[in-house]
């Protein structure tokens, strides 16, 4: 497996941001780490081995990015506006700086540019879903595992424009039927998977809420609920990837 390390300056975040690329051709996949995680977690938690059949066969190239959750979602004692502004800077880094870099690498590898799949577990799933639902023009598929899709756990009753814009269960119900994103959702694939065992209980309500919203809006996101023995942990996430990745790529 070809692995490449990159470090690029981010004007939005005013710092260098690191990422790794796994593979040499195929559909681009953006991996977002768990809460306060780093780009190396894709490799550190052996997810590269789980994805290896698709990476080594040239079906996907995985781009593992960095988070700044410790300055945003996980900075619970800090000013809420400051935290969500930091997250929005990260969102803009992803969409206006990292995505063009991904497109550049993919054009070099494949000879063309295509939509990017978002992938993550836990808080990485929240980011993956939010990126997909906010920018389906950039991200044409989503694979979110064991995520939280409202932000009350992190922001309580506080809500401003940026909190609203980063919470799918807030903004999706108000998306007009004639918005061009609706056609994009309906012609793309997305899946949200969750267990019902230990440490998943707090995540199930927002998952079910998002499930209901998508059904009401006619957004064909696929929701899969695994058993009560399925915990919020990497061993289960490793099992979920080969179960659904062929469908997403099909």
Question: What do the PLM-derived regions correspond to, one by one?
Answer:
Residues 1-250:
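Non-catalytic cap/lid and distal C-terminal segments of serine-dependent acyl enzymes
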């Amino acid at each position: 497996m070809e692995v490449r390390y990159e470090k690029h300056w981010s004007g939005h975040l005013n710092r260098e941001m690191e990422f790794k690329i796994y593979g040499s051709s195929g559909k681009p996949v953006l991996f977002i780490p768990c809460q306060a995680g780093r780009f190396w977690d894709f490799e550190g938690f052996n997810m590269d081995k789980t994805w290896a059949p698709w990476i080594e066969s040239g079906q996907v190239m995985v781009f593992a990015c960095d988070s700044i959750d410790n300055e945003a979602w996980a900075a619970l004692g800090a000013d809420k506006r400051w935290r969500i502004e930091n997250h929005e800077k990260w969102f803009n880094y992803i969409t206006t700086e990292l995505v063009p870099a991904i497109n550049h690498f993919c054009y070099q590898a494949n000879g063309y540019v295509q939509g990017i799949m978002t992938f993550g577990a836990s808080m990485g799933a929240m980011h993956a879903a939010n990126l997909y639902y906010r920018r389906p023009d950039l991200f044409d598929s989503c694979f979110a595992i064991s995520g939280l899709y409202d932000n009350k756990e992190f922001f309580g009753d506080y809500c401003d424009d940026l909190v609203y814009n980063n919470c799918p269960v807030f903004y999706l119900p108000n998306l007009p039927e004639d918005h061009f994103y609706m056609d994009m959702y309906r012609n793309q694939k997305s899946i949200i998977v969750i267990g019902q065992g230990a440490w998943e209980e707090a995540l199930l309500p927002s998952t079910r809420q998002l499930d209901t919203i998508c059904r009401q809006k006619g957004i064909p996101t696929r929701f899969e609920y695994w058993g009560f023995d399925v915990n919020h942990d990497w061993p289960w996430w490793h099992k979920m990837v080969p179960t659904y990745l062929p469908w997403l790529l099909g």
